[in-house]
Amino acid sequence: SVLLPLAKGCQDVSALNDWVQAAARENRELTAFGAVHPFMDGLEQELDRLEAWGVRGVKMMPLLQQVYPDDPQCFRLCQMLVDRDMILIAHAGRDPLDRPEVYGTPERFASLAASFPDLKLVLAHLGGLRMWDAVRRHLLPAGKNVFFDTAYVSFYIEREEMKELIAHMGPERVIFGSDYPWEMPGRAAEIIRDLGLSRAEEDAIFFKNAAELLGQPL
């Protein structure tokens, strides 16, 4: 399992990373990403610290952090991640609370991907929770380094639409996610299995794509 810590404020980052990395070191079945805020002081030092621990990527959440991903102030984070060959995973789209400002729209992430084609970018919720028409328009043509996870989408998308969207993305760009504790992993996995995908497509989504992205042996 991959832990994705979320720091809402700049001041929360370092302590949260200390805690989640300690938890991962105590359980070899866990892989922990780092928390990050693109506007924080000491960003480079925090990324250096995570890199020294062997952390493969970081999580940001534009909606809670109130950050537009294509804001030029985010570019230093993206360049630092490219320089370290680290992954950026981000919440994309709306949330269940229907906040008036989305921040992380598919269009803005497409703009970011165009600015940083070498950035390994994983967009949660199949690229944009409850914004899948915009995902089709703006993110399906995005570069080969843009991936999509399946976390928490099953409450908002019909199975046939989910299957069709995965087919258009290409199963090789889709990574299983649950967004636990908001969705139980077992339930999320059963929904993927019920889509009628091939065994090779399921294997890619459940573990092969993630293992390749993380540089882990299959």
List the predicted regions and their residue ranges.
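Catalytic domains of carbohydrate-active enzymes, especially glycoside hydrolases
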Residues: S1-L4
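Active-site gating/metal-coordination segments in enzymes
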Residues: K8-P96, P100-Y103, Y156
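Short alpha-helical
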Residues: Q11, D41, L129-R130, Y156-I157, ...
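Alpha-helical elements of Rossmann-like donor-binding domains used by nucleotide-donor carbohydrate transfer enzymes
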Residues: W19, Q45, R49, R76, ...
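Conserved, mostly hydrophobic/aromatic
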Residues: V20, L50, V58, L81, ...
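Conserved hydrophobic residues forming the short capping helix/wall of the S-adenosyl-L-methionine
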Residues: A24, L139, G196
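Mid-to-C-terminal alpha-helical segments outside catalytic/metal-binding sites
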Residues: D48, H168-I175, E183-L218
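Catalytic pocket-lining loop regions of alpha/beta-barrel enzymes
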Residues: R56-G57, D70-I175
